[in-house]
Amino acid sequence: MARTEGDTWDIVTSVGATALVVSAMRAIEARKPEPLARDDYAQHFVAATKAEAPLFSELLEDPEAAQAPDIQLFSSYLGARTKYFDEFFLTAGNAGVRQAVILAAGLDVRGYRLPWAAGTTVYELDLPKVLEFKKQVLDEHNARATATVLDLHVDLRDDWPTVLKAAGFDPAQPTAWLAEGLLPFLPGAAQDLLFERIADLSAPGSRVAVEDFGAPGNQADRMSNAMQNEEGALQRIFKSIVEEDAPPSSLWFGDEREDPARWLTGHGWTVEATTAGELLKRYNRVPLAGEHELTDAMGQSRYFTAVLGA
């Protein structure tokens, strides 16, 4: 189904189901001999949706399927992404930041698996059905938070700053913000407003980490085309969560938007950028290059962090 301005979802439909894709890949990454990131809860999210979304469970239950080139590539890509943003939060904590905001948190469990500094509060923002599902699974497996974790049920297209401040967020204190796997799912105007709001709520010393697919027609479309064209388990998974014959990009908004790194630079933030290909080299994982359309598309995905000066 094509995206609309006020659409909504649960964990097994539309945008919500993409969080299950990420969980499945994180579970596969965690089983590798030297995982880039270890998320021991990811497999439980997949298992909890076996009846409604069997493809994800089948992937984890079939070792041969998990070894397919497309799955190994995508799990490495998401493993590198996860590690990069884990390091972002740990660096922020070492710099004295004690409040973190995970935008469109989905099935992110950093509040339960990272070694947060004492006194840290992690605010998770997402739709009610998504966060309720996550909490139910975590409770069933006796998960224990490693920080104060507050789930805030709010759509990022709505007035989320009011909800955030009502929960105790202090704009006078530095914050670590995360926008991971989020931007293509927002309309252009909502993305631009997102960064304006982040800037308005950020004290000096605040940090933001972003996965950026770039302008419409560029990286987002390359990723979508590669996922659609790469025959195998990954293609079947994405076909299961979009309309028949629709590309993965049907879940995304393709309207014009500001370049967030350029915008932040112009508003006093110092930006450092990298790509998925560079990260995989840094983490001593086989670089994404040349063998598949998917490798080239993923390798060009851009990540950046930014710090707000005094």
From Swiss-Prot:
GO terms for biological process: methylation. Coiled coil: none annotated. GO terms for molecular function: methyltransferase activity. It holds the Pfam family LCM. S-adenosyl-L-methionine binds at D126, D155, L156. It is an enzyme of class 2 (transferase). Its EC number is 2.1.1.-. Keywords: Methyltransferase, S-adenosyl-L-methionine, Transferase. Exhibits S-adenosyl-L-methionine-dependent methyltransferase activity. NCBIfam families: mthyl_TIGR00027 (TIGR00027). Belongs to the UPF0677 family. This is Putative S-adenosyl-L-methionine-dependent methyltransferase MAB_4587c. It comes from Mycobacteroides abscessus (strain ATCC 19977 / DSM 44196 / CCUG 20993 / CIP 104536 / JCM 13569 / NCTC 13031 / TMC 1543 / L948).
